[in-house]
Amino acid sequence: MDLKGGKPDESSLADGGPQVERPNIFHTISAEKTKHWCYHAVANVIRAHSLICSFPEADADRTVITEISWGGFLTSVVSGLDHRFKASVSVYGCSYIYKNGPWLAKFQAMSDSDRQHWIELYDPSQYLGSCQTRIFFVNGTTDFAYLPDIYEQSYQLIKGERNFQLTVEMGLGQPQG
């Protein structure tokens, strides 16, 4: 899943959706959902999974989803929606980002109805309770975005097999995750 709705050469896909830039995550909530980054990102992950499963080389009974940061956030949403995955690894991403973290001010600036609408549509807390796959959460104690308190609340939503790793002073990035 590309955060910018683009191809490997970074050019935009015709139906790639809006880019992940901050205004597209929070401030377009009053627009129709087809203008929302989260809507396109989740749909694109599920579409990509369907495509991969259609290949004869792929074992559709053993697919796994993992992504990092905003991708980990999306992994948490998709894990509750697409039950074909056999395992899920959410690195740095979790739910309840409206309760704590760097986006708190963004949510507080929203009207009550816009905030509630965003939570109902996109916060992983709305989906993790439906997760039917094994899920593994990976994070560090010093992550600036997905803080331990909301990480623990996300973990508690999972009814099935779950595990987590919380590494002391784990950096943020692809190599660390």
Give the residues covered by each predicted segment.
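Solvent-exposed loop/turn segments at secondary-structure junctions
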Residues: 5-8, 95-96, 142-144, 170-172
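Structural recognition of the beta-strand scaffold that forms the well-ordered cores
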Residues: 1-2, 64-66, 87-90, 136-137, ...
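Cap/lid segment of the alpha/beta-hydrolase catalytic domain
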Residues: 1-43, 97-106
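Catalytic cores of secreted or luminal carbohydrate-active enzymes
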Residues: 148-177
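Loop/turn elements at helix/coil->beta-strand transitions in domains of secreted/extracellular proteins
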Residues: 60-61, 83-87, 132-134, 159-163
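Primarily recognizes the serine-hydrolase "nucleophile elbow" in alpha/beta-hydrolase
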Residues: 46-117, 142
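Active-site nucleophile elbow and catalytic-triad environment of alpha/beta-hydrolase enzymes
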Residues: 113-127
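Short beta-strand/loop motif that positions the catalytic acidic residue
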Residues: 131, 137-139, 143
